[in-house]
């Protein structure tokens, strides 16, 4: 039984395939599972059509088709997402339904970079996918060595354009279809080569417990003689009794507080950590001075902001979204973590309106400050129904 225990101790990394339609993302996903199974005896081989018929999931009220497969290398355990359609990628990346620690950009060597190749790189930059490795696919169809080099250069240029280190990014040339047919052969070697690159290029993600403490406030009440309690689920980090933390959001400046107790299931703890549903007892604040929508966080780790750039997906009518476009100056509610805040939208130069089903970069200004940082997800709502999803791309003020 020693083996199973060892498997669990491998670092876990989330990755996904991105790239233009028909460049071979799903074929590569299938080829990876079969090659890994063939070479390492780990994971199950998953057939192409199983991945292609991805089940629908709902994330923040949005239906997304996503296929999930798992496999292992010598060093790591990987969870891999693949989406059947371009729209599914856009929704997936913006809602963070499948958070990626890194991505495999699949580009057909026979076609070179195409519009969605570029769009997926841009989306990766906007939503904070930190690392990309390139798999030039269908190399069996290209006899001309110079053509391969040309495509590789084009992809590297694209990566540089969107602030990824294009010159240093690993680029592996292979054929997913050939690896699928013969995982033990030379094309299978290319899949192994791809994962040697991924194992080294995509670093191990920082565990949630190692990040700075943050807990969105869900509810507040006072305990006579003991003080004010804020309840919620700790999103990341660790909070200890007697520690000084900050209350952030809905006011201009964060307010410093001291934790006098942490409770979980009516038991007192020395500390709470990521994933725990806790009540945090606070000294020096009245019940009416803290509210849902604020966060408790490690002092200095997050600031309140009102203005930022965001990447937004607008729901289609069929998804329960708006039936009509919206224009510059549109004022919906923005739902962050636990609360709605009104704000207004500024569209990019030359964009007149946004149609249901579009994805777009926009500037958002909120009427009250919210604890915000790059990568924070939010929903856009009108009268309580979700009409869009977004992610903070960069802070303005």
UniProtKB/Swiss-Prot annotation:
Q: Which EC class is the enzyme in? A: hydrolase
Q: Name one GO molecular function term.
A: GTP binding
Q: How does it assemble?
A: Monomer.
Q: Which residues lie in coiled coils?
A: none
Identify the stretch(es) annotated as G5: 175-177
Task: Please list the residues that bind Mg(2+).
Answer: 26
| Pfam families found in the cross-reference section | GTP_EFTU, GTP_EFTU_D2, GTP_EFTU_D3
Q: What is its EC number?
A: 3.6.5.3
Give a Gene Ontology cellular component term annotated to this protein.
cytosol
Please give the residue ranges the record annotates as the region G1. Answer: 19-26
Q: According to its UniProt entry, what is the function of this protein?
A: GTP hydrolase that promotes the GTP-dependent binding of aminoacyl-tRNA to the A-site of ribosomes during protein biosynthesis.
Where is the protein situated, by its record's location annotation?
A: Cytoplasm
Q: Where is this region: G3?
A: 82-85
| Region of interest called G2, as start-end residue ranges on this chain | 61-65
Give the start-end ranges of region G4.
137-140
Which keywords does this Swiss-Prot/TrEMBL entry list?
Cytoplasm, Elongation factor, GTP-binding, Hydrolase, Magnesium, Metal-binding, Nucleotide-binding, Protein biosynthesis
User: InterPro entries per the record?
Assistant: EF-Tu_GTP-bd, EF-Tu_GTPase, EFTu-like_2, EFTU_2, G_TR_CS, P-loop_NTPase, Small_GTP-bd, T_Tr_GTP-bd_dom
Q: Which gene encodes it?
A: tuf2
Name the reaction it catalyses: GTP + H2O = GDP + phosphate + H(+)
Start and end residues of each tr-type G domain: 10-206
Under what name is this protein listed? Answer: Elongation factor Tu 2
| The keyword Cytoplasm belongs to this UniProt entry's keyword annotation | yes
The text of the family note is: Belongs to the TRAFAC class translation factor GTPase superfamily. Classic translation factor GTPase family. EF-Tu/EF-1A subfamily.
Main subcellular location: cytoplasm
The UniProt annotation places GTP binding at 19-26, 82-86, 137-140
């Amino acid at each position: 039984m020693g083996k199973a225990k060892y498997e669990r101790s491998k670092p876990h990394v989330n990755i996904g395939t991105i790239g233009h339609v028909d460049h071979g993302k799903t074929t590569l996903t299938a080829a990876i599972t079969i090659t890994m199974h063939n070479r390492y005896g780990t994971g199950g081989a998953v057939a192409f059509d199983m991945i292609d018929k991805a089940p629908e999931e709902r994330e923040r009220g949005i239906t997304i088709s996503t296929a999930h497969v798992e496999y292992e290398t010598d060093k790591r355990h990987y969870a891999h997402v693949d989406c059947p359609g371009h729209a599914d990628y856009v929704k997936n990346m913006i809602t963070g339904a499948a958070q990626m620690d890194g991505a495999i950009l699949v580009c057909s060597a026979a076609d070179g970079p195409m519009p969605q190749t570029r769009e997926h790189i841009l989306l990766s930059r906007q939503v904070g996918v930190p690392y990309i490795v390139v798999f030039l696919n269908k190399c069996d169809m290209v006899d001309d060595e110079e053509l391969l080099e040309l495509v590789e250069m084009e992809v590297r240029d694209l990566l540089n354009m969107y602030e990824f280190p294009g010159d240093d990014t690993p680029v592996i040339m292979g054929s997913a279809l050939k690896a699928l047919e013969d995982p033990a052969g030379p094309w299978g070697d290319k899949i192994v080569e791809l994962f040697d690159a991924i194992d080294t290029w995509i670093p191990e993600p920082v565990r949630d417990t190692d990040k700075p403490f943050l807990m969105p406030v869900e509810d507040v009440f006072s305990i006579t003689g003991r003080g004010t309690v804020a309840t919620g689920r700790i999103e990341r980090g660790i909070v200890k009794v007697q520690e000084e933390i900050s209350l952030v959001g809905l006011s201009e400046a964060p307010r410093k507080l001291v934790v006098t107790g942490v409770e979980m299931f009516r038991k007192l703890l020395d500390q709470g950590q990521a994933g725990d549903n806790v009540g945090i007892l606070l000294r020096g604040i009245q019940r009416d001075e803290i509210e849902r929508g604020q966060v408790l966080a490690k002092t200095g780790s997050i600031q309140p902001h009102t203005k930022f750039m965001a990447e937004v997906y607008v729901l289609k009518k069929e998804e329960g979204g708006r039936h009509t476009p919206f224009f510059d100056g549109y004022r919906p509610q923005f739902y962050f973590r636990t609360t709605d805040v009104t704000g207004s939208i500024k569209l990019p130069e030359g964009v007149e309106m946004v149609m249901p089903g579009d994805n777009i970069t926009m500037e958002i200004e909120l009427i009250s400050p919210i604890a915000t940082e790059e990568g924070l997800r939010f929903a856009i709502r009108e009268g309580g129904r979700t009409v869009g999803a977004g992610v903070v791309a960069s802070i303005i003020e």
